[in-house]
Regions:
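Non-heme Fe(II)/2-oxoglutarate
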Residues: 1-59, 66, 75
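Catalytic core of non-heme Fe(II) oxygenases with the double-stranded beta-helix
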Residues: 38-163
Length: 163
């Protein structure tokens, strides 16, 4: 199940960003963006409580949040947020979320593969509305399309639970 909600006044933009490029085995770039992690326990707990209440899934923890900036041409190809094995504490990523922090950019649409026969496409596109949050199972394939103008700013996160 995919949830869509609006979260405001929780985040502040980090001061420094790192190269967030991710490549696959063949060297092809899967993600091009700048990132920073937010480990503020109060913010993480507030987000955890909102999503835990919204999803009604047995969740036990949240990873540090990731702030990302995508400039013109940046994207993140199709991927899932799950790992092959549980973490050392036995937990796995159960729920992912993405919050758009601005709406003064073009492109950078967020797609989730649904394979739902109700849609003509195999995926559903979520338009970039400021502070709207998409909450979805971490095993679902998703992507960020290339940004065409401006800078796309977002917070993403992953909530954990038992397999």
């Amino acid at each position: 199940m995919i949830h869509y909600t609006n979260i405001r006044n929780i985040f502040s933009v980090p001061d420094t960003l790192e190269d967030g490029a991710i490549t696959n085995e063949s060297g092809t770039v899967k993600r091009s963006s700048k990132v920073s992690f937010i480990e503020d326990a109060k913010i993480c707990r507030e987000i955890f409580n909102i999503i835990d209440y919204t999803t009604l899934i047995n969740l036990t923890d949240i990873e540090p949040l990731q702030y990302s900036e995508y400039i013109v041409g940046d994207e993140y190809g199709w991927h899932r947020d799950v790992h092959d094995e549980p973490y050392s504490n036995g937990l796995v990523r159960k729920v992912s979320f993405s919050t758009i922090l601005n709406d003064d950019f073009w492109g950078g649409e967020f797609d989730i593969e649904t394979k739902n026969p109700m849609y003509k496409k195999r995926y559903q596109t979520f338009e970039s509305e400021e502070y709207n949050t998409i909450i979805f199972p971490a095993h679902m394939w998703h992507r960020v399309r290339p940004v065409k103008s401006g800078v796309r700013k977002s917070i993403v996160g992953w909530l954990l639970g038992e397999p």
